[in-house]
UniProtKB/Swiss-Prot annotation:
Record flagged with keyword Coiled coil: no
UniProtKB keywords: Membrane, Transmembrane, Transmembrane helix
PANTHER family: CYSTEINE-RICH AND TRANSMEMBRANE DOMAIN-CONTAINING PROTEIN 1
GO CC field: membrane
Sequence ranges of Pro residues compositional bias: 1-18
Recorded family membership: Belongs to the CYSTM1 family.
Location in the cell: Membrane
Bias type Low complexity, positions: 19-29
Coiled-coil stretches: none
Gene that specifies this protein: cystm1
Segments passing through the bilayer: 87-104
Organism (species): Xenopus tropicalis
Chain residue ranges for the region called Disordered: 1-45
Protein name: Cysteine-rich and transmembrane domain-containing protein 1
Membrane topology of this protein: Single-pass membrane protein
Length: 110
C-alpha cells in the first residue's frame, strides 16, 4: 500500500435532504396556544425543545438499536515515563541544587 497516494474513496450519499430546504409545518407566530401571542413582527430567536432527534439524523440512535445497548468504547492507554535513578550521584546533585536555591532566596530576602 502506498501511504502517499491512497486509493480514492467514493463518499456515501446523504441519508437526508439538505437542511436549508425544509419548511416548518407548524404555525410559527403563535406556536404556544395557551399563551397570548407576542408583539406584531416578533419572531422567537429559537424554537422550543422539539423532543428527541429523528432516526437517521446526526446524534440519533439507529432505528433498530435496543435501548439497553452500551455506549461505544474508546480505549486510551496512558504511559508515564518514570526515572528510576537512585544513585548517590543523583542524590548529591539534588541536594546541591536545593542548597543553592535556598542560598539565593536567603540573599534576596536579606
Amino acid at each position: 500500500m502506498n501511504y502517499e497516494n491512497p486509493p480514492p474513496y467514493a463518499s456515501p450519499p446523504a441519508p437526508y435532504p439538505p437542511y436549508g430546504q425544509q419548511q416548518p409545518s407548524y404555525p410559527v407566530p403563535n406556536q404556544y396556544p395557551g399563551n397570548p401571542p407576542g408583539p406584531v413582527g416578533y419572531q422567537p430567536a429559537q424554537p422550543g425543545y422539539q423532543g428527541y432527534p429523528q432516526y437517521g439524523w446526526q446524534g440519533a440512535p439507529p432505528a433498530n438499536a435496543p435501548v439497553y445497548m452500551d455506549a461505544p468504547k474508546n480505549t486510551v492507554y496512558v504511559v508515564e515515563e518514570r526515572r528510576n535513578d537512585t544513585s548517590g550521584e543523583s542524590a548529591c546533585l539534588t541536594a546541591c541544587w536545593t542548597a543553592l536555591c535556598c542560598c539565593c532566596l536567603w540573599d534576596m530576602l536579606t
